[in-house]
């Protein structure tokens, strides 16, 4: 895969991850803060943390691809 294709693929992956973050943030914001909702909120928090790590890795890979141009 060429550099331009790599960057395009990384951009697509970033967009998907960022869309998922926005959706999770919206869902978490809509849930009332009750004892019953804590497991769901914890699940959202774990997924958001994982997505943040994945997004950072994609950003690093994208920066490396740009540097290799």
Question: Model-predicted segments: where are they?
Answer:
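Low-complexity, glycine/proline/serine-enriched flexible coil segments
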Residues: 3-5
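Short, charge-rich amphipathic interface segments used for partner binding and complex assembly
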Residues: 12, 16-68
């Amino acid at each position: 895969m060429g550099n331009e294709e790599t960057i395009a693929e990384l951009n697509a992956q970033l967009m998907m991850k960022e869309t998922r973050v926005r959706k999770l943030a919206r869902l978490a914001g809509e849930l009332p803060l009750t004892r019953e909702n804590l497991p769901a909120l914890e699940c959202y928090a774990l997924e958001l943390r994982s997505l943040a790590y994945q997004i950072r890795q994609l950003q690093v890979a994208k920066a490396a691809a740009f540097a290799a141009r």
